[in-house]
């Protein structure tokens, strides 16, 4: 399996400016996370390159297209996080399942974040872990 990021024009690889589509789908537009072990996926994003410092807004999908998506509530595929940097919308004023920058957090160009999605407990108990490098 694979896990994909689909989001606004502020997240992409090799740079968000080079692939500035915003919520387009397909392998040419979306970011595929790397499987690092069974049911665990990872992506590294550098602020100012692959991730814009403001207006963070993306979500995780089970394919490079609309379909299976991870949400914060009321869905068969659920994701949560205890990150102090990023939150996941779950009826808290952010779209259900969308990753956003938490209030009061400021990203700086050059900072690098490793995002790991762990599905080992099941697709209804996915966990996003965030590590600043």
Predicted regions and their residues:
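Short, low-complexity, Pro/Ser/Thr/Gly-rich segments in the mature regions of secreted, periplasmic
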Residues: 123-133
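Aromatic-rich carbohydrate-binding modules that target alpha-glucans
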Residues: 1-52, 63-86
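Structured interaction patches on ligand/partner-binding surfaces of diverse proteins
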Residues: 67-122
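Beta-strand secondary-structure signal
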Residues: 42-44, 57, 114-116
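Extracellular recognition modules
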Residues: 59-61
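Extended extracellular/luminal ectodomain segments enriched in beta-structured repeat modules
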Residues: 50-55, 110
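Beta-strand-connecting loop/turn residues
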Residues: 38-39, 122-124
């Amino acid at each position: 399996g694979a896990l994909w990021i689909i989001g606004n024009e502020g997240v992409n690889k090799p740079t968000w400016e080079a692939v500035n589509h915003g919520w387009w789908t397909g392998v040419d537009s979306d970011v595929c996370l790397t499987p690092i072990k069974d049911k665990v996926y990872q992506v590294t994003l550098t602020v100012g390159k692959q991730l814009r410092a403001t207006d963070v807004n993306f979500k995780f999908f089970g394919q490079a297209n609309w379909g299976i998506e991870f949400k914060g509530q009321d869905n068969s595929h659920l994701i949560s996080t205890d990150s102090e940097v990023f939150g996941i919308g779950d009826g808290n004023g952010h779209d259900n399942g969308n990753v956003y920058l938490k209030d009061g957090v400021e990203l700086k160009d050059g900072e690098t974040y490793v995002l790991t999605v762990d599905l080992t407990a099941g697709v209804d108990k996915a966990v996003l872990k965030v590590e600043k490098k």
